[in-house]
Structures are given as structure tokens and as C-alpha cells.
């Protein structure tokens, strides 16, 4: 089981440049051009077809190397200068000329974007039309997982015929009790978990970028500025909120710096790491304990997202990554089994109603809230103040509460997700046609 934990962490905790949904689209486009083996001039048209959740998360977020937002510019950047061997850092090292060509391709209408009628959360299909023939790429389930490659009618890869890594829905880790996972992590030698520390400096650097005036919404900077003025206290909770929000401010506005992602999300990685970093800085936590705390946080994030989906109507930063951070912080405080159980109940009793309405600069507000609630939930649980069984969705155990969260996400939030997407598409159409509509009418969107 130790080996599976390490394999899962190495698969799910990886660097990413830019919001992972548009970056995954860029990755698919870069791969399509690679297998096609053609120059940009030879490409007649590009069709990008994505799941509703990928569309939602990529609609309003800044894309590195440009002042543009959305999936079309991400696709264009992937075509002109993307390096698919770099995975979710596909846009690293792009040249200015490649960026300019990408903007030109988008302006020319070379790229068409459509939504696929699918229940898949992560689904990206790219079709390059090249002088009478096509190249096709499909990414599914994970943002960097190619499941289908085709060139000129010849299938180069089909995941249905190739045995591979355990799919996330088959991972036995997610069917274990949480206390068992933590007990195994506690026994893993430090040298085998030392790679967890890679995300600390990476995500702190993004936070430092966001602490400059005028970055994103300025949520992190506002905390920092008011702490300097003495309006806010320089305590663990405000430090966690400041760092976490600042990193999101920078990332959502299109910073070219990488962050360490978690379970396919850079913002999840920020939330899973930086509240723990704030605690570690305040209490001088040694690297060995910090690495184990980070492993706990990332695995709790993946554990919960196994039940609610990688992308959903619920904000993964709040309900999954925030819960992971809270469990890890409580563990650093010396929490026992009952207190760990209580942390999860406290978190999900608090933030389970936080919706995901796409990636955007406003996410910094939700990340700040998630960091604050993570500290609060840990402190309450350490003092044995735990939401009682039967309060709302809170069950007798943490695992039962997570199962209730799954029911909320899968059965209760489908119409919510459709309504969110409907509203966002209305805004998008108004933006594209330069029409300002003061009253948004409800549209029915059926997946």
C-alpha cells in the first residue's frame, strides 16, 4: 500500500503553468500538431470539443503569455509553441513570435470551440484538419492523460486496447479508511516523501508574485497591506489566507510561473499546500513532518475528489483541498483519530455549499475562505468541538460524511451545474457580440 500511495502522489502532484483546463486544451493541441507533423501554415482548421466542466473552468481565466482569457487562445498557443513532452508545463519557454501567431490564429477564426454532450468531467477532443486529412487527440479523466491518438485514419493509441496505470476510479486507496492512509504515511521514510517539498517553494513564489499591488483581484495584497497597517493581526489564520489568496491572484490573472498542482488543479495545489506552509513558518515545522503533512493533504484532496469528481458544481478548493489542508494542519498539531474525523466533519459542515462557477480571478476569494476555514476547523476539532452526527450532511464518520457529499454532488448538484454554465454562456455570448444585457434570462442547458 505504501508503494500505491507514493505512485498516486507522483501521478497527482505535478507542476503546472496556467489554469489546468486551458492548459490541458493547449496540451491536446500541441500533441495533435506533433502527431500530424505539419507546420502551422498547413493547418486548415482546428476543432476543440470539451466537456461542460472543462468549458466552464476555462471560460474566464487568464492564459499565460497573453492578455486574453479562455480556451481558444490556449488552443492557439498550444498549436504554435506548445511542447507536449512538458506535460502541464506545455507553454513554458514560448517565444514572442509564437505568441503573436497564436493571437492571429484566434482572430482569424481558425479555431472552433464546442461543448460535448457527455457526463465525463474531464474530456478534451482536438481535431486538426490538414489539406484533406485529419489528426485527432482525446484527453480524458486526467488533464494530462491521452486516451486516443489518430492520424490520417490510423489509430496510434486507444486506451481501451492498452493496459495502463490504474484508473482513479479503481484505486483501492479511495476505499480505505482515512486513519489507515494516515498511519501508512506516518511510516514512510522521509527520503521517499522528500519530493513533496518541491511544491512549497514553487507555490510560495507564486504567492510572493501575488503580494504585489495590482495583481489579479488583489485579495492577497489587501490582507498583506492591512496586516502591515495593523488593521489585521499577523496570525496563523490571516497568514494562511494571505498566502493562499495571493497565489490565486497571480495564477488566475495568467502568471507564467508554475505551481504544484493537486489532483489536476493548480488552485487545489495552492490550497492543499499554502495553509500548511503558513502553519510551518509560524511554528518552525521540520521538513520531515512537513513532507508527511503535505502528503496527507494531497491524498485527502484526491480522496474527496474521487467521490465528487475532478470537476464538479462544488468548489474543489473548499470541499477537497481545504479539507486536506485542515486534516494535515490538525495532524501537525498532534490530532488523534477522533479529532481527524472531526476536522473533516467541521470542514464539510461549513463549506459544502461553495459552488464552482469556473476559474477566474475571483477564485482568490474562495481560496482565502478555504484557508481560513481549514485553520478554524482544525482548531475546533483539537478542542473537541465537532459538528454532531445528523447536523445536515454530517454522518457518524468522516467517510460517511464524504459519501453524503458525493450524493450532494452527483444527485443534487447536476441542475446547479447546468444553471451555472447557462449563466456563464449568456455572459460569453454577450461578450462576443459586445451586447450589454442587464437582465440575464434563464436558459436550460442539457448535458
Curated annotation (Swiss-Prot):
GO molecular-function term, one example from the UniProt record: L-cysteine desulfhydrase activity
One GO process term, biological-process aspect: L-cysteine catabolic process to pyruvate
Top-level lineage group: Bacteria
Pfam families: SDH_alpha
Family: Belongs to the UPF0597 family.
HAMAP family, A to Z: UPF0597
Name listed for the protein in its UniProt record: UPF0597 protein Amet_4665
